[in-house]
Amino acid sequence: MTNFEELKWRGLIKDTAGEDIEEKINKGDITFYWGTDPTADSLHLGHYSSLVTAKRLAKMGNHPILLVGGATGLIGDPRPTAEREIISKEAVESNLEGIKKQVERLFDGNVEVVNNYDWIKNFNFIDFLRDVGKYINVNYMLDKDIIRRRLSTGITFAEFSYTLIQGYDFLHLYKNKNCIMQAAGSDQWGNITTGVDLIKKMTGEEAYAFTMPLVLDKYGRKFGKSEGNALWLDRNKTTSYEIYQYLINVDDELVIDYLKIFTFLSKEEIEVLDEENKNHPEMRNAHKILAREIITDLHGKEAYEEAVEISKSLFKGDIKKLNANEIETAFKGLTPYQITEEKNIVDLLTEADICKSKREAREFITNGSITLNGEKIENIDFLVNKNVAIEQKYVVIRRGKKKYYIIKF
């Protein structure tokens, strides 16, 4: 396959700009950019498809630039339905540094990170209108999907101007970095074409761009959302275990598509996994390899192996194999019930709201529905103290088959 054919096979090409873009990508040795606004101090799994595509283009012999929008982040990309909240300058600067470090680590330093505030700050309002606004027709902007959808509910001038700044970013990089191509998610097509058209009008030369389809789950939600919350790339915000659980449970019908998008496995390797997934879906080999490739890339091999071990221990109910740090990782979403002294199991189950009453607690114990650190408790006089806690700190209580509670000394 040619470079462009591989991108198409992996489902990474939706819209394109530039007549000979296929030839440019196949030839390689071009400078391209991908941009994001620093709306948080970490990127999330939804951004990861674009990052992997940028890494893929780099492996094809091209030169990546990541633009972090210190200027555009102060305004906010127009949403389809409502205005974004304005972020403070201090938050934008802090977020920008966090994202920069994250991206440089993912690319092993082989990426240039730029901040559009560095060149936008030098514009005064009149100069921007003369040098940029003069070349963009209002009717042209009104025809863009995101603008058109907001007209009925109202759109601020700041949001309306966002596409001008992003368009100028492409022009600036084109002139100063010989950056001839932009890659982005398909929701950015309107902003991308502004840049392509601006370059054409101001230089008479052609620029190139392509968009990637947004990665969705089977319900049409953006990939990387777990119960409405983003799965962050920063380990301190989202653990490797949380990402592992999300990936190991993705829909069978989508796992092969995700392998194409998010991994560097070859076509032949993915086709083998496709056959295995069709013939033996219960083995979940494709899911396991998807998790292995993503987590190893994001957090390292050791973090992936730890996530696997935590998952195995919980599945087998072998809680005692986990250490205190692994307990914290595995049950990050649970608020521990804290105690400072020895407690009778019946009293503890009631006080911690694990059971509604002492009578119910005794019933759960006698019918074998309560386990403590993986071991069934059948004695209503059992005492919970530091000696039974993992590292004298944590007690994991399971009620029934799936309901977990954490007790902390």
Descriptions of predicted regions:
Residues 201-409:
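Conserved nucleotide- and phosphate/pyrophosphate-binding catalytic cores
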